[in-house]
Regions:
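Local sequence-structure signature of Cys/Sec-based thiol-disulfide redox active-site neighborhoods
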Residues: 1-25
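Terminal leader/tail segments of proteins
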Residues: 2-3, 13, 30-38, 77-88
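Conserved short-loop catalytic and cofactor-binding motifs
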Residues: 5, 9, 42, 59
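Generic recognition of short, well-ordered alpha-helical segments
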Residues: 15-19, 46, 66
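Thioredoxin-like thiol-disulfide oxidoreductase module
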Residues: 30-50, 55
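Non-catalytic, surface beta->alpha helical segment in thiol-disulfide oxidoreductase systems
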Residues: 55-87
């Protein structure tokens, strides 16, 4: 699974998004990318119209920061479910 978190430099809530990204990066099987839309040459995807925006496998799952612990638990549960499905 791939989680992309879109931020900007001037976003007041994006520091929390970076913290969430750092913690999510420790989840086995999850690739996490923080995309700073202020970086030179960075394109803004059509589905991103606010920051922070969380995109999981190409699908927007949160506009704004989700509640951290619940969000991370949900990611772990989804990965565990996918792992179980593959094992069948």
């Amino acid at each position: 699974m791939h989680l992309e978190i879109y931020i900007t430099d001037q976003c007041a809530n994006c520091q929390e998004a970076v913290v969430i990204a750092e913690q999510a990066g420790g989840i086995v099987g999850l690739e996490v990318t923080v995309v700073n839309l202020d970086a030179p040459g960075q394109r803004v995807p059509a589905q991103v119209f606010a920051v922070p925006t969380y995109v999981l496998n190409g699908m927007v799952i949160s506009l704004g920061n989700p509640e951290r612990d619940g969000f991370l638990a949900g990611l772990r549960a989804e990965l565990a479910h996918r792992s179980e499905e593959r094992a069948k």
